[in-house]
């Protein structure tokens, strides 16, 4: 029996970092990720706090709308759009506590009908339903 030939693996070498010892890129270099320009409010901590509280209220409102939409979907026919433009339809049953998976029944896929299934939320691009 012959021993397998080792296939060489390409190695990516990063340039030296700004301090000369590490590898990587300078944070202010031309390859640094672009960050959106956000005006900083430094003069008044109360204004900064109110901006953070406004963002928090907006997030809370969006989360509440999302959770209410999940509650309204229970027992209804829902159409899901997945990656690669795949469209499936199913009766929505439930979701887990982390809202990471949807439990559905009568899942109609391009290759047939599945009696029960779990859809990962990370695979779902959008969903629609009629209440």
Swiss-Prot record:
Plastid as a keyword?
A: no
**Can you supply a Gene Ontology BP term from the record?**
mRNA splicing, via spliceosome
Locate the N-acetylmethionine modifications and list their residues: 1
Primary localization class, coarse: nucleus
- Where's the SUZ-C domain? 1-29
Q: Where in the cell is it found?
A: Nucleus, Nucleoplasm; Nucleus, Gem; Cytoplasm
What keywords were assigned to this record? Acetylation, Cytoplasm, mRNA processing, mRNA splicing, Nucleus, Phosphoprotein
Q: Name one Pfam family in it.
A: Gemin7
Question: Phosphothreonine (modified residue): where?
Answer: 3
Q: Which GO terms describe its cellular component?
A: cytoplasm; cytosol; Gemini of Cajal bodies; nuclear body; nucleoplasm; Sm-like protein family complex; SMN complex; SMN-Sm protein complex
Q: Outline the extent of the Sm domain.
A: 65-131
Gene3D superfamilies per the UniProt record, alphabetical: 2.30.30.100
In alphabetical order, the GO MF annotations are: RNA binding
Self-association state and partner proteins as the record states? Part of the core SMN complex that contains SMN1, GEMIN2/SIP1, DDX20/GEMIN3, GEMIN4, GEMIN5, GEMIN6, GEMIN7, GEMIN8 and STRAP/UNRIP. Part of the SMN-Sm complex that contains SMN1, GEMIN2/SIP1, DDX20/GEMIN3, GEMIN4, GEMIN5, GEMIN6, GEMIN7, GEMIN8, STRAP/UNRIP and the Sm proteins SNRPB, SNRPD1, SNRPD2, SNRPD3, SNRPE, SNRPF and SNRPG. Interacts with GEMIN6; the interaction is direct. Interacts with STRAP/UNRIP; the interaction is direct. Interacts with GEMIN8; the interaction is direct. Interacts with SNRPB, SNRPD2, SNRPD3 and SNRPE; the interaction is direct.
User: Per the similarity annotation, which family is this?
Assistant: Belongs to the gemin-7 family.
Write out the function statement from the record.
The SMN complex catalyzes the assembly of small nuclear ribonucleoproteins (snRNPs), the building blocks of the spliceosome, and thereby plays an important role in the splicing of cellular pre-mRNAs. Most spliceosomal snRNPs contain a common set of Sm proteins SNRPB, SNRPD1, SNRPD2, SNRPD3, SNRPE, SNRPF and SNRPG that assemble in a heptameric protein ring on the Sm site of the small nuclear RNA to form the core snRNP (Sm core).
UniProt name for this protein: Gem-associated protein 7
Organism field: Homo sapiens (Human)
Q: What is the lineage of its organism?
A: Eukaryota, Metazoa, Chordata, Craniata, Vertebrata
């Amino acid at each position: 029996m012959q021993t397998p030939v080792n296939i060489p693996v390409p190695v990516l070498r990063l340039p030296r970092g700004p301090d000369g010892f590490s590898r990587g890129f300078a944070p202010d270099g031309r390859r640094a990720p672009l960050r959106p320009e956000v005006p900083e409010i430094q003069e008044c901590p109360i204004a900064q706090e109110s901006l953070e509280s406004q963002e928090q209220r907006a997030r809370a409102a969006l989360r509440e709308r999302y959770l209410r939409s999940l509650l309204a979907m229970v027992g209804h026919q829902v159409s899901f759009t997945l990656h690669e433009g795949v469209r499936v339809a199913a009766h929505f049953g439930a979701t887990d506590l982390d809202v990471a998976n949807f439990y559905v029944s009568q899942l109609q896929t391009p290759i047939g009908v599945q009696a029960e299934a779990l859809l990962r939320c990370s695979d779902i691009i959008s969903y629609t339903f009629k209440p």
